[in-house]
Amino acid sequence: MNHPVTYHFFWNGPFSQWQTCHMELDGVVFNTAEQAMMYLKAMLFDDKTVAQEILDATDPGQQKALGRKVRGFSEAQWDLYKEEIVYRINRAKYRQNKGLRRKLFQTIPHMMIEASPVDTIWGIGLDAKNAALTDPELWPGQNLLGQILTQVRTELADEFPDEAAACSSEGQETLND
């Protein structure tokens, strides 16, 4: 089963939470969306010590590992806020970084799909090759990041219509990054 017209599969690269990019959110400067997510996770649970360690860390892998050490963490509470947090982060990321925003606009009109074979929450739990061969109804993951990026792209296309139109008509490859 092939989905090249409908989907834009990504895992790493510009649409990844680990992509280096400077952004400001709530007066705090971050070097990756992963850093922002882990910081806001720590702050949600009022763990200011780990939050500061996350800000001091420059590597997204280290930032993620620190995010797993948040004291007082509750999966149920995180589930209530995680999508809104990641939405706000990605809106800031693409609004404040024109080059990344243009790359996001180049995926119009395709639905963004995080083809991560290891992530069934933010991704689909399959790599792009296997996803293209599988009915989307059977993808094991939720694709929360892909859904959020699709929403952010739509909203930013309304905010930057000329840029979105120019980028989406460039005929970029949309199957993978």
Set out the residue ranges of the language-model regions:
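Charged, low-complexity intrinsically disordered segments
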Residues: M1-D177
